[in-house]
Swiss-Prot record:
Catalytic activity entry: pyridoxal + ATP = pyridoxal 5'-phosphate + ADP + H(+)
Family: Belongs to the pyridoxine kinase family. PdxY subfamily.
Binding site residues for substrate: S12, T47, Q48, D225
Lyase among keywords: no
Role according to the record: Pyridoxal kinase involved in the salvage pathway of pyridoxal 5'-phosphate (PLP). Catalyzes the phosphorylation of pyridoxal to PLP.
Lineage: Bacteria, Pseudomonadati, Pseudomonadota, Gammaproteobacteria, Pseudomonadales
Subunit architecture: Homodimer.
SUPFAM superfamilies recorded: Ribokinase-like
Cofactor(s) for this UniProt protein: Mg(2+)
Organism: Pseudomonas syringae pv. syringae (strain B728a)
Record GO biological process: pyridoxal 5'-phosphate salvage
The protein, known as: Pyridoxal kinase PdxY
NCBIfam families hit by this protein: PRK05756.1, pyridox_kin
Any one GO CC term of the record: cytosol
Length: 288
């Protein structure tokens, strides 16, 4: 019997709705991955609601929780770490300490860093030093980084002028250490208004993917968290990087179709669960 992969997911949690682990854990489980959720923050709801309550996990709690997993002899069974929203740079450094410990216990373990930053339209709040930490420290340890365009712009210190420029910016981030960059959402002058575009960039090649852009009165939150989680999960399940990239795009599109059909603001993960596991659509990644 094939072994089920285990993944430590270190990111935010909301009690109501879907963001961070609340967006990614169930879909990752649904496609066949054992997920160990470690919540960096616990908020009542995501921050696009403009008001929320909750608290940030103290940085020292992260290694303490990983110590607990090690104490029961399970740390070597961790096949990957996924990190997302950080409450502080100190929290990020605690995560990197945990990643190093897991990679020591299992040298084949992977680390995907989803470099969540502030978004002026979505009300996502991160501490100012988090951006520097992600670029200067996390990138060197990550196997994969999955920025959106806003985050890629922040890393590059500029906005792109073309798709080719986006590719150059992703390659510059790749040079800092990761073996692959997934740009979850491209935005550049001349991009088709009715399309949602993504990039996969490795040292050997690059791929561009386009799917239809669905309209919503208010854009759902958690789409990027879902994308990163599904991509990493499919890699753990044996997909090559391009297949995992294509699967993540298709499964996320299925969730958005269901969310749109229901007129929902929050992602309809439960209603779309069978389509997450077995997407009916397919989007081809085109090699550039």
């Amino acid at each position: 019997m094939k072994r089920t992969p285990h993944l430590l997911a270190i990111q935010s949690h909301v009690v109501f709705g879907h963001a961070g682990n609340s967006a990614a854990v169930f879909p990752m489980q649904r496609i066949g991955v054992n997920v160990w959720p470690l919540n960096t923050v616990q908020f009542s709801n995501h921050t696009q609601y403009k008001q929320w309550t909750g608290e940030v996990l103290a940085p020292q709690q992260i290694p303490a929780l990983i110590d607990g997993i090690a104490a029961i002899g399970e740390l070597g069974n961790c096949d990957a770490v996924l990190s997302g929203y950080l409450g502080s740079a100190a929290q990020g450094r605690a995560i990197l300490t945990g990643v190093a410990r897991i990679k020591a216990a299992n040298p084949k373990a992977l680390y995907l860093c989803d470099p969540v930053m502030g978004h002026p339209e979505k009300g996502c709040i991160v501490a100012p030093e988090v951006s520097d930490f992600l670029l200067q420290e996390a990138a060197a340890m990550a196997d994969f980084m999955c920025p959106n365009q806003l985050e890629l712009d922040s890393f590059s210190g500029r906005k792109p002028e073309s798709l080719h420029d986006c590719l150059a910016m992703a390659r510059a981030l790749l040079a800092r250490g990761p073996r692959a960059i997934v740009v979850k959402h491209l935005d550049y002058p001349g991009k088709a208004a009715d399309g949602f575009e993504m990039l996969l960039v490795t040292a050997e090649a690059s791929w561009h993917l386009r799917r239809p852009l669905l309209a919503f009165p208010r854009q759902p939150v958690g789409v990027g968290d879902l994308t990163s989680g599904l991509f990493l999960s499919r890699v753990l399940l044996g997909d090559d990087l391009v297949a995992a990239f294509e699967f993540a795009a298709a499964a996320v599109h299925e969730v958005l179709l269901e969310t749109q059909a229901c007129g929902s603001y929050e992602l309809e993960l439960v209603r779309a669960q069978d389509r997450i596991a077995h997407p009916r659509v397919k989007f081809e990644a085109v090699r550039l």
